[in-house]
């Protein structure tokens, strides 16, 4: 709903369908069947729309190889997970394909709440495994904690921006994206960081457009 008028506002899937020039195909993935049912009712029997009610990582690892450079295919992938749920393998696969540009909401809130705790013994094995899956390896254990101990003997976590910069570097150096501009922090009403909005591509033109979008978002008070 629009906060000012109270009128319904189109969600991002329906807005994507209205983009001109239009994409040849649209692939929407969500584990929430109810959301997909609403979208299915809105799009009807359009042959260019594909809906997947499953884990997005599994679906993307099937879709990405079909976007072939040799067939002059290109794709824009928007990753907006519920939390720290994107598998690093998906990002690596997209980078290797060289045909896919990505916007990605990286959940710093989830990391701070569940993984980067002062007392690391309180981090469950499940949460530890989620971080390993999202980061791709165990390097985060060295990169995201300072070497200085607190008064209570715990290693202090680095600040949010340092976490974001470390992930930016991984997208470039490890995953293999050529162009990874500095991300933008997405904040709540109390100005606390929720996500970092990343763009990753093999295309400098796409990166320039992303930088302009990020700059505009920052200037209007994001």
Language-model segments: what does each one mean?
Residues 1-222:
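Class I S-adenosyl-L-methionine-dependent methyltransferase catalytic core
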């Amino acid at each position: 709903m629009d906060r000012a008028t109270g009128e319904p506002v189109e969600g991002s899937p329906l807005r994507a369908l209205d983009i001109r020039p239009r994409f040849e195909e649209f692939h929407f993935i969500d584990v929430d069947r109810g959301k997909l049912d609403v979208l299915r009712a809105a799009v009807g029997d359009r042959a260019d729309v594909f809906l997947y009610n499953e884990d997005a990582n599994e679906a993307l690892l099937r879709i990405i190889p079909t976007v072939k450079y040799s067939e002059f295919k290109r794709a824009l992938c928007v990753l907006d997970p519920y939390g720290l749920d994107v598998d690093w393998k998906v990002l690596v696969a997209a980078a290797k394909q060289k045909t896919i540009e990505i916007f990605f909401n990286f959940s710093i809130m989830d990391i701070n709440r569940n993984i980067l705790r002062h007392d690391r013994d309180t981090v469950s094995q499940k949460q530890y495994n989620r971080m390993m899956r999202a980061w791709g390896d165990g390097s985060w254990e060295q990169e995201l904690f300072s070497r200085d101990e607190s008064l209570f003997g715990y290693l202090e976590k680095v600040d949010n921006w340092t976490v974001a910069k470390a992930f930016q570097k991984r997208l470039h150096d490890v995953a293999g994206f050529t162009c990874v501009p500095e991300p933008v922090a997405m904040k709540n009403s109390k100005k606390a960081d929720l996500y970092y909005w990343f763009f990753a591509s093999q295309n400098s033109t796409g990166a320039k457009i992303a930088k302009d979008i990020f700059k505009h978002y920052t200037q209007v008070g994001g």
